[in-house]
Design a protein with these regions (language model features):
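Active-site loop/oxyanion-hole signature of alpha/beta-hydrolase fold enzymes
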Residues: 2-38, 188
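Conserved serine/cysteine hydrolase catalytic core
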Residues: 121-161, 170
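Alpha/beta-hydrolase active-site loop signature
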Residues: 1-4, 65, 175-178
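Catalytic active-site module of serine/aspartate enzymes centered on a nucleophile-bearing elbow/loop
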Residues: 166-199
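Catalytic nucleophile loop
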Residues: 39, 43-44
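Flexible "cap/lid" loop of the alpha/beta hydrolase fold
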Residues: 45-85
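Conserved catalytic-core motifs of eukaryotic protein kinase domains, centered on the activation segment
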Residues: 6-12, 70-72, 153-154
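Conserved alpha/beta-hydrolase catalytic His-Asp/Glu region
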Residues: 69-74, 83-135
Length: 199
């Protein structure tokens, strides 16, 4: 809720459990009896929290670790300034995709600026306060780009160690956002994982 064209309910307070519930509600509404959940960054925390028995697999792409992701208090005013300064979110998104940006990158910046006002600081606070409530027991693929300025390799290793059936795939020369930097590689990785969990 509150991203892209999805409205946020009045009084919405960002939290990982609230986002996870919204994802589960969506899957039920579209009649998806089984799903492979793919989560990037904050979405990795959401997918981790949303995974349940009917989940066939989990792919975590430079995801926030199950122990949460603290943001230093001094950074919160900077996050709040993104609401007024168009260049600030653009610079932040550029840092998250250091090797390549798609032609539609300006549209991504526009979309980011339409985010619900509660999200600017709220998402960082949600990640700081979140701890995974349980470890999903099915197959998990943890993807980590070595140029990520936000998620460290140690965090990615801790994420993989948290799940009983996880493996870590390290991607050299990729930053935080493989989905932007090399979507073809991500597609191939996802197709391979889908074949594994379908077999």
């Amino acid at each position: 809720p509150g991203f892209g064209e999805s409205p946020a309910p009045e009084g919405f307070v960002p939290s990982i459990p609230a986002y996870a519930q919204a994802l589960r509600d969506f899957l039920r509404a579209v009649g998806a009896e089984e799903a492979v959940l793919v989560g990037h960054s904050l979405g990795g925390a959401v997918a981790t929290e949303a995974a349940e028995e009917r989940t066939r697999g989990l792919v975590l792409l430079n995801a926030a670790p199950p122990s949460g992701l603290p943001t230093p208090e001094a950074y919160y005013p900077v996050l709040e300034s993104y609401r007024q300064d168009r260049k600030a979110p653009e610079r932040a998104l550029e840092a998250m995709a250091p090797t390549q940006r798609p032609p539609w990158f300006p549209e991504l910046v526009d979309c980011a600026q339409r985010m619900h006002p509660a999200h600017y600081q709220g998402n960082a606070r949600a990640l700081a306060h979140w701890r995974a409530s349980r470890a999903y027991g099915g197959p998990v693929l943890v993807l980590y780009g070595t140029l990520d300025p936000l998620i460290s390799r140690e965090m990615a290793e801790a994420t993989a160690a948290f799940f009983p059936k996880a493996r870590l795939q390290v991607l050299e020369g990729v930053g935080h956002s493989l989905n932007l930097e090399n979507p073809g590689l991500l597609k191939a990785i996802l197709e391979g994982f889908l074949k594994e969990v379908a077999g």
